[in-house]
Design a protein with these regions (language model features):
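Alpha/beta-hydrolase superfamily serine-hydrolase fold, recognizing
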Residues: 22-36, 42, 48-64, 83-341
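A domain-start/cap signature at the N-terminus of enzymes
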Residues: 73-87
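N-terminal Sec-pathway targeting helices
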Residues: 1-19
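Beta-strand-enriched cores of mature, soluble protein domains
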Residues: 57-58, 68-72
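General helical structural elements
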Residues: 8-9, 67, 336
Length: 341
């Protein structure tokens, strides 16, 4: 075979799988995401590939997204007045948990209130730059340190590993002399909200420390498939099919009960939980279950603030410069500020 034919064969061997992958992804785009009534102050959620396909192509798409997100977060530059640090925290099984630490510039070595930020992403997606953006806003406005663990994703290590990575990060925060131990905040969005809720339960049950507060943003709280919003908004920004796959990968066939920490709604003892803020997006399959967890905590005697955001969708707060988003960030900051010195 001539050199030219060899080159063409190699190019075809490379491009053909890429082309097949692209075509399959195009057939899986959620075209119905724009069918709902969103706030006119927010950009409509963009169409994207449905994460609900649990097969080879679905896995490849997730890996591709994670590769891009990991690259972007590594290259992310902190805004003026903020320092971004990279640290590693030992996990209980010997793994080193990579973490980003976002802190007000000039205060890196001071004792500060500290937030554990459990990022969202269906337990199988890695951290995104929008979460670093939000962490920077909190660090600046609250003059606190924000620690974001890059916990192992469920594709590689299902429950309980992602939870324990976050909890072991909280243990390191508690042991750090630069932490104001009386003002530790636990925060999470989406699946990170599930992790944050479970970390808070575990922390209170084991007596690690007394968190000043927990903040759960459009959180995953239950694996039941009976909430009306799961059908009402099944094709919205976070689709029902993706939610089903999320739980399948996270639990990995494990039978969960109220005695463990996989599903916040199943946990039986909630009365010792700290002051809590739960935010739900109105146009979101997770709206009902977030409100249900808030109600369960209220019934247990927990001081709970439930904030419903009209016209908002799952992940609506990705652009911290949007006026609608900034208004909600200010609401969160005001609430968090009420529990800090």
């Amino acid at each position: 075979m001539s050199t030219k034919k060899w080159i063409l064969t190699i190019i075809a061997a490379i491009l053909l799988p890429v082309l097949i992958f692209a075509i399959v992804c195009l057939t899986r785009i959620n075209m119905k995401v724009g069918d709902y009534e969103y706030s006119p102050e927010l950009p409509k959620p963009g169409i994207g590939v449905d994460f609900g396909y649990d097969d080879l192509f679905g896995d490849l798409y997730v890996r591709w997204c994670n590769l891009l997100d990991n690259t972007q977060t590594a290259l992310w530059k902190a805004p003026a007045g903020i320092t971004k640090q990279s640290v590693s925290i030992p996990a209980r099984d010997g793994f080193s948990i990579p973490c980003y630490v976002i802190v007000p510039a000039g205060h890196e070595d001071e004792k500060l209130p500290t937030m554990l930020y459990c990022h969202g992403g269906a337990f199988f997606l890695t951290m995104m730059t929008c979460q670093l953006d939000a962490a920077s806003v909190y660090a600046e406005e609250l003059q606190c340190r924000v620690v974001l663990p890059q916990y192992r994703i469920s594709f590689d290590a299902p429950y309980p590993t992602p939870l324990y990575d976050c909890y072991d990060t909280l243990k390191a925060i508690a042991a750090d002399p630069k932490t104001d131990a009386d003002h530790v905040l636990i925060y999470g969005d989406s699946a990170g909200g599930c992790l944050a809720a479970s970390v808070t339960q575990l922390c209170c049950d084991e007596g690690l420390l007394a968190p000043a507060a927990q903040m759960l943003i459009y959180p995953v709280t239950d694996n039941k498939d009976t909430y009306p919003d799961l059908t009402k908004f099944e094709h919205a920004a976070w689709p029902h099919k993706g939610n089903t796959r999320m739980w399948k990968r996270y639990l990995n066939g494990q039978d969960v009960t109220g005695s463990d920490y996989a599903v916040p709604m199943l946990h039986e003892t909630l009365s010792d939980l700290p002051k809590t803020y739960v935010e739900v997006a109105e146009v979101d399959i997770l709206c009902d279950q977030g409100a249900a967890y808030a109600e369960k905590m209220l019934q247990a005697g927990v001081d709970v603030t439930l904030q419903s955001v009209p016209g908002a969708y799952h992940g609506y707060d990705g652009d911290v410069h949007n006026t609608f988003v900034r208004r909600m960030l200010d609401t969160r900051i005001a609430w968090l500020g009420s529990v800090l010195p």
